[in-house]
C-alpha cells in the first residue's frame, strides 16, 4: 500500500546497518530511538512494539537507501545486505511501503558538510541529532523495559536514524 502524502501520527526512520538504528517520532512531539537489535526476531519485536495500536495509514517509514562499496569486505557486505533485507521484509510484512532516501539527500537537507572524513561526519550528525532532541522532543519511559530503549542519549548507532526520521517529518508536513 502506497503511503499518503499527509501528516502522519508516527514517522519512522531506519538506518539499516548492523550498527545502525531505528527512530520513531510520534505526533511530532515524542521521539524514541533504538540501536539495531542483534537478530531478526528482536528486530520484529521492536518494530511491532513501535507500531502497536497504530493504523498503517498513520505510519510513514523512511529507510536509508545504501549500497556496498568496492572497498567493503565480503563479510561486512553480506552482513549489511542481510540486515537491510530484514528491515525491508519486516516493514513489508506489515503492509507498509517505505520511502527510500539516499544518504546524500537527507544530509544535504540538514546541511551536513560534504568532504568530511567518516568519523568527523558521524560526529557532526550526532551533534545535529542531539540538538534536535534537546529542543524538539520529549522522550520518556513509553517502552520501558525494552533493552534497546532510548534513554535520551544520542549515540553513533542512533544518530542517523534520528536524522532520517526528522527528514521524514520535514517531508510530510
Residue ranges and their predicted role:
Residues 1-173:
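Phosphate- and other anionic-substrate recognition elements at nucleic-acid/protein interfaces
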Amino acid at each position: 500500500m502506497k503511503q499518503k502524502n499527509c501528516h502522519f501520527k508516527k514517522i519512522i526512520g531506519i538506518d539499516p546497518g548492523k550498527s545502525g538504528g531505528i527512530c520513531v517520532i510520534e505526533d511530532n512531539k515524542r521521539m524514541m530511538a533504538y540501536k539495531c537489535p542483534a537478530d531478526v526476531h528482536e528486530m520484529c519485536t521492536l518494530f511491532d512494539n513501535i507500531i502497536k495500536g497504530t493504523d498503517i495509514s498513520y505510519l510513514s517509514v523512511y529507510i536509508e537507501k545504501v549500497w556496498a562499496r568496492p572497498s567493503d569486505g565480503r563479510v561486512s557486505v553480506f552482513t549489511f545486505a542481510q540486515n537491510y533485507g530484514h528491515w525491508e521484509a519486516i516493514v513489508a510484512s506489515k503492509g507498509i511501503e517505505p520511502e527510500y532516501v539516499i544518504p546524500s539527500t537527507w544530509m544535504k537537507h540538514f546541511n551536513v558538510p560534504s568532504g568530511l572524513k567518516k568519523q568527523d561526519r558521524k560526529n557532526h550528525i550526532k551533534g545535529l541529532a542531539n540538538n534536535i532532541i534537546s529542543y524538539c522532543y520529549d522522550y520518556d519511559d513509553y517502552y520501558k523495559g525494552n533493552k534497546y530503549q532510548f534513554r535520551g542519549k544520542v549515540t553513533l548507532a542512533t544518530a542517523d536514524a534520528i536524522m532520517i526520521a526528522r527528514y521524514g517529518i520535514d517531508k510530510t508536513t
